[in-house]
Amino acid sequence: MLHKASPALSLLSSGYTGGGNLFPPSRNSSNLLFSPSGSRFSVQAAKGTNTKSLTGVVFEPFEEVKKEMELVPTTPFVSLARHKFSDDSESAINDQINVEYNVSYVYHALYAYFDRDNVGLKGFAKFFNDSSLEERGHAEMFMEYQNKRGGRVKLQSILMPVSEFDHEEKGDALHAMELALSLEKLTNEKLLKLQSVGVKNNDVQLVDFVESEFLGEQVEAIKKISEYVAQLRRIGKGHGVWHFDQMLLNDEV
């Protein structure tokens, strides 16, 4: 690192004509020796110079990394990438993976129901199939993140969903959409719980991942499905359900 001479030193160097050291070294100095050379001074570091004072070093990577080097696992089955990632966070992510897969499975059952020939609501079938794929995508995002942080993905059992969604009073369309709204709110609660686990364990990276990738999107999903429920309650079980289905099919709602 190069250091420019201060103005004070420049003035002294231009007017000094004597020999020897202008500033003799002392125990409290930085051990810099000033030697005259004609009309100039040469600055040299004496033996034993304090390099921190000379270079302004505030970070010594080879010293500070020693502690981290000691923490690098040597056994073949332990993650090398894991850092500041608690067991609680790892377990909570696995739980959220299971939530996303279960919700995806219910949506897939709804898709299969509305795609039947004796139900024939293709718009609802498309909506729930897209929803199923989206939730599965969320599960895969959490799996990828788990591996990225050095955790271990542990898939859990998925409950078998019901296959009949007709409702004598509400009809199948409204009943299914109310179920979807409840699932989205439940998913939001689970995401908030996962976020709180990150906060509790001072895992700012997990908190950022949940907040930036999921929480905002979850609010949008709840709002959209809430509007669908309100509209279906207005039209009842009659001919309006078919028109609503066509709007879903053509992405007009």
From Swiss-Prot:
Keywords: Chloroplast, Iron, Iron storage, Metal-binding, Oxidoreductase, Plastid, Transit peptide. Induction: By abscisic acid (ABA). Its EC number is 1.16.3.1. InterPro entries: Ferritin (IPR001519), Ferritin-like (IPR012347), Ferritin-like_diiron (IPR009040), Ferritin-like_SF (IPR009078), Ferritin_CS (IPR014034), Ferritin_DPS_dom (IPR008331). Residues 46-82 are annotated as: Extension peptide (EP). It catalyses: 4 Fe(2+) + O2 + 4 H(+) = 4 Fe(3+) + 2 H2O. One of its GO terms (molecular function) is ferroxidase activity. Its main location: plastid. Residues 83-236 form the Ferritin-like diiron domain. The keyword Metal-binding applies. Gene3D superfamilies: 1.20.1260.10. It is found in: Plastid, Chloroplast. Transmembrane segments: none annotated. Residues 1-45 form a transit peptide. Disulfide bonds: none annotated. GO terms for cellular component: chloroplast. Pfam families: Ferritin (PF00210). Fe cation 2 binds at residues 135, 184, 218. The keyword Metal-binding applies. Fe cation 1 binds at residues 100, 135, 138. CDD domains: Euk_Ferritin (cd01056). GO terms for biological process: intracellular iron ion homeostasis; iron ion transport; response to abscisic acid; response to oxidative stress. Stores iron in a soluble, non-toxic, readily available form. Important for iron homeostasis. Has ferroxidase activity. Iron is taken up in the ferrous form and deposited as ferric hydroxides after oxidation. Belongs to the ferritin family. Oligomer of 24 subunits. There are two types of subunits: L (light) chain and H (heavy) chain. The major chain can be light or heavy, depending on the species and tissue type. The functional molecule forms a roughly spherical shell with a diameter of 12 nm and contains a central cavity into which the insoluble mineral iron core is deposited. This is Ferritin-2, chloroplastic. It comes from Arabidopsis thaliana (Mouse-ear cress). The lineage of its organism: Eukaryota, Viridiplantae, Streptophyta, Embryophyta, Tracheophyta.
